[in-house]
A protein has these predicted regions:
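N-terminal "arm"/small-domain region of PLP-dependent enzymes with the aminotransferase-like
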Residues: 12-71
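Conserved PLP-anchoring active-site segment centered on the Schiff-base-forming lysine
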Residues: 121-137
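Active-site phosphate-binding strand-loop segment of PLP-dependent enzymes
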Residues: 143, 154-211
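Conserved active-site segment immediately N-terminal to the catalytic lysine
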Residues: 204, 218-229, 238
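Conserved PLP-binding catalytic core of the aspartate aminotransferase-like
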Residues: 319-355
C-alpha cells in the first residue's frame, strides 16, 4: 500500500505531481523522522548514476561519462559539475543569498554544533542560545565547553510545546552570535518565520528538519546548517551556508584546519573527499523541488497535509496535539493519548502503534521525551498518506 510523490513528467503540472501518489507503490507509509522519504524520481535518477554518471552534473539525456558516481574522483570535471550545480541550486531553489558561501560538509548537524562554536565565537564574548529542545540543548553543551554560554530564552517549563518569545535584544547584545533551532523534530515545534536578530549580532540557525519546506528569509541568518536526511537527500551530507565576511574573522582560539569554514570555502567543499553520492542526490532533490514549482508550490502542499492532521487531532476525544497553536511544525506532527491515567494512556498508545504498524503505517512512535506519536511528513511524503492516517485514526477511535 501507499506510495511517494510522483515524478514530474515533462510538461506536466507541478502542483498535480506534488499531490499524486506514485505509480510505483511502497509497502509502508514511511513517517520516519530521518533518514526520510525521498521522491521516486530521485531514486531512479540516483540509481542511473550508480550505474553510470552522466555529463553536466547528471543532466537528463546527457552522455554517460564512463564511470559510476560511486567510483569517480571528486577532483574530476564530471564531479565538479555535480557539486557546482548543487551549490547553484541552493541559491536558486532554497533562496540562499549570494552574499553567503554554500558548503557541503560531513558529520551531520552534530558536528556543526561544535564547528560553529569554534569558528564564530569571538574573544571575550559569550555565545547566546534559545533552548527549544534536545537539539538546541546539544548545541548549547558544545558551546559551554568552549566558553561562556547564555540561554536567553527557553520553553523547557512546558516540555517544549511552544516556541518561546524571541529574546529581548539586550539579552544577547554582547554575544558573538545568537543560535536558534528553527524546527524541533522531537517536540514538533517550528518558528513561523525566521526572526531578525538586532544590534548586528549574527543569527545562527539550525534548520535541519524543515529546510526546503517553504520559502524562508534565510538572508536573516549569518550562518545556517541542515542535515540533508530530512528534506534534502540522504544522510552523510550537511548543507552549510555562511556569510562571506565571517570567513575572514579570526576565531577566539585555535581551530584545527579541517574544522575551519574558511578551509572548506577556499576549496569549495573539496578540501577532503566529500560524500560524492550524497551531494549528487541532494542536487537531484533540489532539481525535483525546482521542477515541482519551487518552494511556494511545495509549501502549499505541506500546509495542506499538516492542516489535515492537526484538524483531526484537535477534533479527537482520544488524541491531543503536543505543540501549541502558533508553534506547530508542518514537518513533524507530535501527539499523545488524551486524558486517561498514565498506565491507560501507555496501553492505548501501544495498542494504536501495533495496529498502525499492521495497517502499514511505519515510524509513528514518538520520542521518549514526548511519548505518544510522531508523524514526519516531509516534502516527498504524499498527501494520500496523511489522508490514510487520518482515516485510520478516526476508525481506531470509533472502535474504542
Amino acid at each position: 500500500m501507499g506510495g511517494n510523490l510522483g515524478a514530474v513528467a515533462a510538461g506536466g503540472s507541478a502542483l498535480a505531481s506534488l499531490a499524486m501518489v506514485s505509480a510505483k507503490p511502497a509497502k509502508l507509509w514511511n513517517f520516519s523522522a530521518g533518514p526520510a522519504i525521498l521522491p521516486p524520481e530521485v531514486f531512479e535518477r540516483a540509481a542511473d548514476a550508480v550505474h553510470e554518471l552522466r555529463a553536466e552534473g547528471h543532466a537528463r539525456g546527457a552522455k554517460g561519462v564512463g564511470m559510476s558516481i560511486l567510483e569517480i574522483s571528486h577532483r574530476s570535471k564530471p564531479y565538479e559539475a555535480v557539486t557546482f550545480g548543487a551549490e547553484q541550486l541552493c541559491h536558486e531553489v532554497l533562496g540562499i543569498p549570494e552574499t553567503h558561501q554554500v558548503l557541503f560538509l560531513q558529520g551531520g548537524a552534530s558536528l556543526q554544533f561544535a564547528m560553529l562554536a569554534m569558528n564564530l565565537r569571538e574573544a571575550g564574548k559569550p555565545a547566546a542560545y534559545v533552548d527549544t529542545g534536545v537539539w538546541s540543548q546539544k548545541a548549547i553543551a558544545e558551546s559551554q565547553g568552549l566558553g561562556e554560554t547564555l540561554t536567553v530564552a527557553s520553553s523547557a517549563a512546558t516540555n517544549y510545546d511552544r516556541i518561546p518569545a524571541f529574546p529581548d535584544a539586550a539579552s544577547y547584545a554582547h554575544a558573538s552570535y545568537l543560535h536558534i533551532t528553527t524546527n524541533n523534530t522531537i517536540f514538533g515545534t517550528e518558528y513561523a518565520e525566521i526572526p531578525q536578530a538586532e544590534g548586528g549580532v549574527p543569527l545562527v540557525i539550525d534548520f535541519s528538519s524543515h529546510a526546503g519546506s517553504r520559502p524562508m528569509a534565510l538572508e536573516r541568518a549569518a550562518f545556517g546548517y541542515a542535515g540533508a536526511q530530512k528534506n534534502l537527500g540522504p544522510s552523510g551530507v550537511t548543507l552549510v551556508y555562511i556569510r562571506k565576511d565571517l570567513l575572514a574573522k579570526k576565531p577566539a582560539a585555535h581551530v584545527p584546519v579541517i574544522l575551519r569554514y574558511a578551509t572548506h570555502a577556499k576549496e569549495p567543499s573539496l578540501y577532503n573527499t566529500p560524500n560524492t553520492f550524497g551531494v549528487l542526490v541532494l542536487k537531484l532533490v533540489l532539481e525535483w523541488m525546482r521542477d515541482a514549482g519551487g518552494l511556494p508550490a511545495i509549501a502549499a502542499v505541506n500546509e495542506r497535509k499538516a492542516s489535515k492532521l492537526y484538524a483531526a487531532l484537535d477534533a479527537s476525544q482520544v488524541f491531543r496535539a503536543h505543540a501549541q497553536l502558533g508553534s506547530r511544525s508542518r514537518m513533524n506532527v507530535t501527539w499523545t493519548a488524551n486524558g486517561a491515567p498514565e498506565a491507560e494512556r501507555e496501553a492505548l498508545s501501544e495498542r494504536f502503534l501495533k495496529q498502525a504498524q499492521a495497517a502499514g503505517f511505519d515510524g509513528l512512535k514518538g520520542h521518549r521525551l514526548v511519548g505518544g506519536f510522531r508523524a514526519s511528513i516531509y516534502n516527498a511524503f504524499p498527501e494520500a498518506g496523511v489522508d490514510a492516517l487520518v482515516e485510520f485514526m478516526a476508525e481506531f477511535e470509533r472502535r474504542l
